[in-house]
């Protein structure tokens, strides 16, 4: 029963992505070269987090689940940076409002997918410890004093750096 809401949200995100792709194809809409490259970077990060979360769930692997939150934070950072960059392109007239809306839909969907993966990872970790204190766990893992989190976060920042 607990999995149904997450699955439904994930299905809604997938449907949103499919609708966006269909709209772009039907209306012959294309992103700028820069926007396409940025989406490729974020897409790669999202593909990695999906793979990590799926494997952690299937194997009930707490250690693997612990690698997910730093990547989720990098994806959050990517969303903010991509939003800012695309807004500048819109203001400069390099992109249309229509492509801007589609771009924002895609990065929002990517970020929500990463959030679902993070939620799954936290569940795996917390249930392995016999508790379910997600907010406390996330606060402690993201603290500056958590060297493992910070190292992973910095590694992912380098891996998914925008140029």
Could you say what each language-model-derived stretch is?
Residues 1-163:
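Cytosolic, long alpha-helical scaffolding segments
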